[in-house]
Amino acid sequence: MSIVIRRLEKRFGEKVLFTGLDLTVEAPAVLWAPSGWGKTTLLRILMGLEPPTAGTVQGVGRVGAVFQEDRLCPHLTAVQNAALVLPGPPQQYHAALRADFAALGMEDAALALPAVRLSGGQKRRTALV
């Protein structure tokens, strides 16, 4: 499934956030850009929470977002935090989550450190899992 964005524009009064945005996105995809580039606004448009000033968006199904602030339980490990949102007993996901964290270069920290001791980048990667 693709999301097709054509001639998208978003203005807030006189401030132009983006204009003439043409983009085709194949799932799964990650939206990554520096602060202030309109990522959150674009996601809000895709989720139907914010109308565009002009342009069209087609093919939007389910949209997920990872926000800039993590919402981790500080006393749990990264693996325990990731398992909180999954249905069923957390133990059934342990091996799969360990593999996910290993792919992110966090295999040791994900099991050993409480979230309060993770770096900012490790916390954001935990939120992605």
Language-model features: locations:
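Conserved structural motif at the start of ABC-family nucleotide-binding domains
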Residues: 3, 16-20
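Conserved ABC ATPase "signature" region
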Residues: 93-109
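Conserved ABC transporter NBD signature motif
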Residues: 54-64
